Amino acid sequence: NWNYKPFEIPNKILNEWKKIGKKGQKLENNWNKIYKRKKIIINNLLKNNFTKILKTEKKNAIKELKSLATRKSSELTLNALTSVSNNLIGGSADLAGSNNTKTKHHKIIKPGDFNSDYIHYGVREHAMSGIMNGLALHSNFIPYGGTFLIFSDYCKPSIRLSALMEQRVIYVMTHDSIGLGEDGPTHQPIEQLSGLRSIPNLNVFRPADRMETIECWEHALKSSKTP
């Protein structure tokens, strides 16, 4: 039933093929238009100036020698990091003001607006930890989230998964003193620290001053396979 000469293409087939060619050409043209913009975005995500920024922060810490709470030291470090980074995604479980995890450079992620870098998780420590695992698995994002050390128990299943999956997820646990604070014994972490230290492939740091806090952030950011 083939009544055509060798290498002759019937018009019906040729016309359909041309339609596909036009569709492909349109896709290629669209890609060429957005390529330059995408290239800049992707390069910014892959590139970070963490080492340079943290080196400057260490010099400042030596010069100033201020006595600061480590959560305040962490905020100062984060403020420097978020001024240049496009892939640090911060957040807190309704304790941003206490954890000092939100900086002046952050923009809040809202429904319908995901072009930002800070999440208000609410009183949802377990959900926060699970979401951070998802962010780390999805792309080149480096998620970090804050809560009180006592509430690390709510995060424990996801923290363990971070370690098992070798994901760079950073947990900022403040208010780690065993001293009885204004919130009473329900907020008094006793066994939490030893429990976290028993998890394989989980780095647990407890800095004493601003310099150690900067070093902790540097190590956490460099540890690509360890939460």
Task: List each model region and its residues.
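Conserved acidic/glycine
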Residues: 1-124, 134
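Conserved thiamine diphosphate
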Residues: 120-227
